[in-house]
A protein has these predicted regions:
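Post-HExxH zinc-binding segment in Zn-dependent metallohydrolases
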Residues: 242-243, 367, 378-406, 413-414, ...
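Long, well-ordered alpha-helical segments
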Residues: 196-207, 212-213, 251-255, 359-369, ...
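A well-structured
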Residues: 1-277, 281, 564
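C-terminal, non-catalytic "cap/extension" segments appended to globular domains
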Residues: 227, 354, 362, 389, ...
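Active-site recognition of the HExxH zinc-binding catalytic motif
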Residues: 342-367, 384-387, 392, 430, ...
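Glycine- and acidic
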Residues: 122-123, 181-188, 228-234, 269-280, ...
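Auxiliary, metal-adjacent structural segments of Zn-dependent hydrolase domains
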Residues: 275-334, 347-348
Length: 564
């Protein structure tokens, strides 16, 4: 069934409230485990319907933020989603207190109960107004980003459309593009500062209402981090500082030499070669056709999956006016359909989206047989393993897109993945400091950003882009506003994806089997258990980075990048 035919209906809150209440009541009054399972199944059906409507609004609103109908529905969803979550929470209470708990654990697994108990620690009806305010502020940020109209090259462009100019072979074009983008953020500095300040305050208020000292521990629990805490993440950041930051500096020096510039500036970072980066050699349609070939040849499972996606119009890839920036994958439960949203811009990023978001989509397609919604996706850090590993597992097909620039693409891809990690931990350390010190001023935050940036990105130099010397670079990082503490997950997953890259070069078949099994498990196991089942070393364990990173360095050192 085509995505355009997926039916949307406005959710009636009172009706849903009555349905939940009735079903939870029959779950609690059930005289045997069979009765509870029957009620449980009906609750899942209701939750799937709600989730489907929420997702359809979210997708259609992000495709066209100017569509008045879905703009209004999106505001309505922001308003009611915390209340709807409250209904699920009421079910969790009934579930963990079930008199047939042992039998239910046998049927559904203990993880569901651990997740339910964890959620009960971060939600109560008392914080619904705060969660609504958080949603409203998050949407306000997205709209502000989408509102960018930058006059450049005789056109009016949004932020996604500015990316090719920031990667131009002409240094002067790069400088001007970087300045124009920075000016947008500088001109709106007060509004970005105010939105973030309000978000920090409202999140802190929620955490304190729920009995936490600050938002840090509360935020971790919201992300269902059952196995690690802020202390362990701090230890991991230390490993990054010791094992990756020196290599980061080395790679930036190589880049400086390749580009033949006296000093590598911020606006040079995105351009890897004077001859230009490796860009795909064709149109979006051409890319999609090669994508079909790639997934057909990769495995029978990926062939079936990608055929389903293309035949049902489940990819929205082109950048257009009023469309939100970025890329994501989501899932529409009633249709058992993943959906990929992206903004193609003619750069290698288009291919990364095609592999990265397809990694997410492929995983949920493999695990869509789970009835329990909690098992469709794993927790965030595990989710990112599928997407980032798919980027590497598709390497043998990169020649379809890049032709004689394939070696260049691979060098850029692998080095960029490594260069990303210190930036990822910069974002993470910044957020920990922000939520540990919620009362500081926006100016303090901007100064702290620059200080942490210096620690993990010692080569960064903003050159003539004076606006960024004021510590506003992070305004463009959507996760800092809308998904606190999520960003470190990309770096943890990157370390796991590096291991898949290493394994695929040693034994491709075995690497694919490990990956496929990981996808099939969905969210039915915890992060640490999933890593174990895929034969991956845990990034938190001392020595993991020291074991993985040298193999990446060895490959990068073997490339004659001066002649690519």
């Amino acid at each position: 069934m085509n995505f355009n035919d997926y039916k949307y209906e406005h959710l009636d809150l009172e009706k849903i409230k009555g349905q939940f209440s009735e079903l939870i009541d029959s779950f609690e009054r059930a005289e045997n485990v069979e009765g509870q399972i029957e009620a449980f199944d009906k609750i899942i059906k209701l939750r799937n319907h709600i989730e489907t409507m929420q997702t359809l609004v979210s997708i259609r609103h992000s495709i066209d933020t100017n569509d008045e109908f879905y703009d209004k529905e999106n505001e309505y969803m922001d308003e009611i989603s915390p209340i709807l979550f409250g209904f699920t929470n009421d079910f969790y209470k009934a579930l963990v207190n079930s008199k047939f708990k042992d039998e239910l654990i046998k049927k559904y697994g203990k993880l569901l109960f651990d997740l339910a108990e964890n959620t009960l620690k971060v939600f109560s009806n008392e914080i619904i107004p705060d969660a609504q305010e958080e949603n409203r502020l998050s949407s306000k940020y997205s709209k502000l980003i989408a509102s960018a109209k930058i006059d450049f090259d005789g056109k009016e462009l949004n932020l996604s459309q500015m990316v090719p100019y920031t990667q131009s072979k002409d240094r002067n074009v790069r400088i001007e593009a970087a300045k124009k983008v920075a000016q947008f953020f500088a001109e709106n500095q007060e509004e970005f500062d105010n939105i973030y300040d309000s978000l920090v305050k409202v999140r802190t208020k929620m955490a304190q209402k729920m009995g936490y000292k600050n938002y840090v521990e509360f935020g971790y629990k919201q992300l269902s981090r059952l196995e690690y805490d802020a202390k362990m993440v701090e230890g991991y950041r230390k490993q990054v500082l010791e094992n990756i930051v020196p290599l980061h500096t080395e790679l930036r020096k190589r880049q400086e030499k390749r580009l033949g510039v006296e000093k590598l500036r911020f606006y040079d970072e995105a351009i890897k070669f004077n001859s230009g980066n490796a860009d795909p050699h064709g149109s979006p349609e051409w890319i999609l056709n090669h994508g079909k070939t790639m997934y057909k040849e990769l495995s029978k499972e990926t062939d079936e999956f990608f055929t389903f996606m293309t035949e049902n119009n489940l990819l929205d890839l082109l950048s257009k006016k009023g469309k939100m920036s970025g890329g994501y994958c989501t899932y529409i439960p009633e249709y058992k359909a993943p959906f990929i949203f992206a903004n193609f811009n003619g750069t290698a990023h288009d291919i990364d989206v095609l592999t990265h978001e397809a990694g997410h989509a492929f995983q949920v397609y493999q695990s869509r047989g789970f009835d329990v919604p909690e098992y469709l996706w794993p927790t965030y850090e595990a989710c990112e393993i599928h997407s980032m590993s798919m980027e590497f597992l598709t390497w043998p097909w990169m020649k379809l897109f890049f032709e004689n620039d394939t070696d260049k693409y691979k060098f850029i891809h692998l080095s960029e993945a490594l260069l990303f990690i210190p930036y990822g931990v910069t974002v993470d350390e910044f957020q920990h400091w922000v939520y540990e010190n919620p009362e500081v001023t926006p100016q303090d935050r901007r100064e702290k950003w620059l200080e942490i940036e210096k620690k993990y990105l010692p080569t960064r130099d903003y050159g003539e882009v004076d606006e960024l010397k004021n510590g506003i670079f992070w305004f463009r990082q959507v996760h800092i506003f809308s998904s606190p503490f999520y960003y470190i997950d990309y770096t943890l997953a990157q370390v796991c994806a590096f291991q898949f890259w290493i394994k695929s070069r040693e034994d491709r078949e075995k690497a694919w089997q490990d990956y496929l099994n990981l996808c099939k498990l969905g969210g039915s196991k915890s992060f640490f258990e999933l890593m174990k089942s895929a034969n991956l070393k845990n990034p938190f364990e001392e020595g993991t980075l020291a074991a993985v990173i040298p193999k990446i360095k060895e490959y990068l050192d073997s490339v004659d990048d001066m002649n690519l």
